[in-house]
Amino acid sequence: MNRIFKTLALAAAITAMAVPAFAAESAPLHQTVKSPQKLEVKSAGNEHFTGEVVTAALYGPQAPSKSYAATVTFSPGARTYLHIHEMGQTLIVTEGTGWTQEWGKNPVMLKPGDIVRCPPGVKHWHGGSAKMSMTHIALSEAGGTVTWMEPVSDEDYPKD
């Protein structure tokens, strides 16, 4: 009987040591630093954007976190189509000037340092100004969908 208890105790101890080892493999237990020179910059395409837009992923979701971030640069006049984020979105303007607009409301000019918090379910668009490019960091959560809608027409786009 003692032998069974010793075997069970040993098995429990080995299991207890193994669990943290597996957890460490799923997420690094140290800080990571990524140089901007190593970011992959790519075109956002024209499926959901008007004008030239480029993106660079800063980081992806890593369990248990669901957050991810990217830089997005809009050339002058470039903008997103109207869209809705199921999980919401935060934008931090880092360069240039641009616009954001909730459906049915007046456009709001954006400048470096501005932080836009768009709650879940709010129909909106954002982009560069007519005369100047804009770069922002976009922060979102994985697991939610983005519902893309119609483009913002030249008539509805602010002319600075």
Indicate residue ranges for each PLM-predicted region:
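Short, conserved beta-strand element in jelly-roll/cupin
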Residues: 71-75, 84-100, 139-141
